[in-house]
Amino acid sequence: MAKAVGIDLGTTNSVIAVMEGGRPEVIVNAEGNRTTPSVVAYKGDERLVGQIARRQAALNPQATLFEVKRFIGRRWDEVKDEAARSPFTVKEGPGGSVRIEVDGKDYAPEQVSAEVLRKLVGDASAKLGQKITDAVITVPAYFDNSQREATKQAGEIAGLNVLRVINEPTAAALAYGLERKGDETILVFDLGGGTFDVTILELGDGVFEVKSTSGDTSLGGADFDQRIVDWLAEEFNKEHNFDLRKDKQALQRLIEAAEKAKIELSNASETSISLPFITFDPETRTPLHLERTLSRAKFEELTADLLKRVRQPVEQAMRDAGVSSSDLNEVILVGGSTRIPAVKRIVKDLTGKEPNESVNPDEAVALGAAVQAGIIQGDSNLGDIVLVDVTPLTLGVEVKGGMIAPMITRNTAVPAKKTEIYTTAENNQPGVEINVLQGERPMAADNKSLGRFKLEGIPPMRAGQAQIEVTFDIDANGILNVTAKEKTTGKESSITIENTTTLDKSDVERMVKEAEQNAEADKARKERVEKRNALDQMRVQALQQIDENAAAPQDAKDRLKAVADEAEQAVGSDDDSRIAEVQGRLEEELRNFMTQNSAAAGAQEGAGQPGAAQDQDDVIDADFKPADDNK
């Protein structure tokens, strides 16, 4: 059976891992790195993913997509302010969804994320020597139903069978607690590139039980970067009266410099930011440069409100779990942004514990996902591990007066199922519309509507007489299904989401086909590049042979040089048949040249030996063993 993998599909970077010999191991990518930037770039028909995409971002800002996880499964009205700060075009799509426009074509965030997944799985398949089809993918614990569905769809578009969608902090706890014995209560503090989660778990006897979770899906390292971007832009504007954020290329350079400065300030008290030729004076066309020094103290001042936002979810999670700082055995830090010194100080202040840094914050989530994949596949090395997770937000329906009637409250263990009986509000009401809500506010309008569906065909009866059985069913992925049944007639309806941010089945199928076609095109493109490279290498080898064999007959050198020149022209062309034809001729000419010179060299060597025949036509090539002086 092919191995299943665990994937941390991150905002900034992504990681893939697999169980090997009872232990989860990170699989390095084709470039030899353990993390892959979650960056996708489009250049004509070509797609670049990972580090190669990140490297060309400054020159291709409008077609280089990053931090797309912040848009996945969300509505346009939730992200339009964030979208305005992006170097690429993010706009409203069908039904209030989000789309990213590149060169006149619209992409769903799920499609872009699928490219990252395809790169991870493709590289891992090559490393493992087997095609990977099954995966566990992680999501922030505070992701809502739409975001979870969209993440699962990204996996399907990438050609994966998504075994499970699990929460990132829970996965990190699996990685941490895999080989630990005894009972522990731990707090996982997960501050990544775009999201923030806090989860409290109890560990013991192979059981990982989540007691509470809280978070903020709009808080992460990118927000800290943005504060540096804004500061740099405002400082430059004061000096030159020009807002760099209006120049897409300059903005991309600011974003890259801000992230670099943030990372450096984790280990240094100040850092220099140098961006020469950041733009040109609009009047004189002389180049303008940006030079600034940013201290850690100034960085903490710029991000003071973000640091304050970190506190509330920690306090909420501890309150919901009914634990105090003295009840916590360990505090685990996950996510690259936990390296920020001010964040570590806040964690210590809130929990009274020195954070445990024994797990790699960049890899722990993927490692835990690999453990979950192993559990699902029945890996005998893992023993009896039981994972009990919870739903992060309250789920309910809208009732009379615009209120929310909770069905499943936050921090309920999943999978979970709950049924309630509702009735009609008016006489002879022929049907009801059920508005499914997610959130903690008492009024329906203040919570997120996951979707609406109708139950028709209710027989005429007085208000309050109809009995409508509504069932909420959350699966192990945290994904919700809702059904409604009128008990008198037995009529039943299940949720059909209207104006959803997720894709319908036909969209997913179309995108899967597109992704497969793209993969075939990518393979063909790679093969063409490899053929060009092979011809170019042979051309270089031919020129080296000419240089190294100066005494060779001039006509032989001229013939080889002529075909080598043809090869140079063919490499620069887009004609595959010409490349193949020239390669065949160059191969033959080079072989003849090397054979002729090898024979000539052997003849010269023989002529230099005592008693050798003077007629080169009589020379016989042979391998002689050295004489043994002792015989």
Swiss-Prot record:
One Gene Ontology MF term: ATP binding
Induction: By stress conditions e.g. heat shock.
Family matches, as InterPro entries: ATPase_NBD, Chaperone_DnaK, Heat_shock_70_CS, HSP70_peptide-bd_sf, Hsp_70_fam
Biased composition (Low complexity): 599-614
Region (Disordered), start-end ranges: 593-631
Location of Phosphothreonine modifications: 195
Biased composition (Basic and acidic residues): 622-631
Keywords, in A-Z order: ATP-binding, Chaperone, Nucleotide-binding, Phosphoprotein, Stress response
Database matches in HAMAP family: DnaK (MF_00332)
Role this protein plays: Acts as a chaperone.
Entry's family note: Belongs to the heat shock protein 70 family.
Name this protein carries in UniProt: Chaperone protein DnaK
Protein species of origin: Deinococcus proteolyticus (strain ATCC 35074 / DSM 20540 / JCM 6276 / NBRC 101906 / NCIMB 13154 / VKM Ac-1939 / CCM 2703 / MRP)
